[in-house]
Curated annotation (Swiss-Prot):
Designated name of the protein: Alpha N-terminal protein methyltransferase 1
Region listing for Disordered, in residue ranges: 1-57
Superkingdom as given in the UniProt entry: Eukaryota
PANTHER family to which the protein is assigned, alphabetical: AD-003 - RELATED, ALPHA N-TERMINAL PROTEIN METHYLTRANSFERASE 1
Role according to the record: Alpha-N-methyltransferase that methylates the N-terminus of target proteins containing the N-terminal motif [Ala/Pro/Ser]-Pro-Lys when the initiator Met is cleaved. Specifically catalyzes mono-, di- or tri-methylation of exposed alpha-amino group of Ala or Ser residue in the [Ala/Ser]-Pro-Lys motif and mono- or di-methylation of Pro in the Pro-Pro-Lys motif.
Name of the gene this protein is made from: Ntmt
Reaction equations catalysed: N-terminal L-alanyl-L-prolyl-L-lysyl-[protein] + 3 S-adenosyl-L-methionine = N-terminal N,N,N-trimethyl-L-alanyl-L-prolyl-L-lysyl-[protein] + 3 S-adenosyl-L-homocysteine + 3 H(+); N-terminal L-seryl-L-prolyl-L-lysyl-[protein] + 3 S-adenosyl-L-methionine = N-terminal N,N,N-trimethyl-L-seryl-L-prolyl-L-lysyl-[protein] + 3 S-adenosyl-L-homocysteine + 3 H(+); N-terminal L-prolyl-L-prolyl-L-lysyl-[protein] + 2 S-adenosyl-L-methionine = N-terminal N,N-dimethyl-L-prolyl-L-prolyl-L-lysyl-[protein] + 2 S-adenosyl-L-homocysteine + 2 H(+)
Amino acid sequence: MTTTLEEQLSDKLQMMDETTDKVQGSSKQKDDSSIAASSDAKTASPSSSDSSTKVAAPESEFYNKAQKYWSEVPATVNGMLGGLGYISAIDIQGSNVFLREIRVPGNRLALDCGAGIGRVTRNLLIPRFSCVDLVEQDPAFADKAREYCTSEDGSRGKVGQIYNVGLQKFTPTQQYDLVWTQWVLGHLTDRDLVSFFRRIKQGLAPGAFLCLKENVSSSKKTVEDRNDSSVTRPLDSYEHFLKEAGFRIVRKVKQQNFPKGLFPVYMIACKPVSKE
């Protein structure tokens, strides 16, 4: 993964009490391999709300600890979602509605960042695109993803490259119609997050979208999870970092119908300021 996670949501969802949003020991979601800055990842650069990520440990330790955490997680949907595998269908439904609303102009090639075992690739991206590339840092997840995403006849031949690298080191070499990151950006330092956004900008086809789906803190503070070495940022931090990297936000929607007690989850679609 890099991810983040996808994170992912990459996107690893864990119950937390709404009243403990300020408590730094609280858990958080991650998805499809929110693996330390691999396929679901995290970043630097102070935001206007003074919510910049404060990584107590050295940067290498921050990433290594997250990588170790995800290496011990089962390569299953339930593992990717922190024991909350039952929310996968609701999550995919919300993402499908979001993509219909923004009307991605092309259907040739998509990129799943922090892909984990490919939950988002299989259920959201493969039905929409001719080919999907994945970025996933964890080797076991990457191996499982190719199997999981090609187990149905309609998906054969639709999985392209699987980049086994962290998002903090990933540079796209293709032009994508859509780049999707989910539950992984919390595994990047602020500095690496902005740098990742800037590199992704160079890998977007004309009119293409970068989409984020991430947990956000309910307060203006960044919440640190030392267990998996990640952070949950306020929504305005993502807005600030996207602007700093040269993106404009086209649409922003809160995911509905998730169980109570989880962090709010937002989807953000954006385009480079210099591209239409």
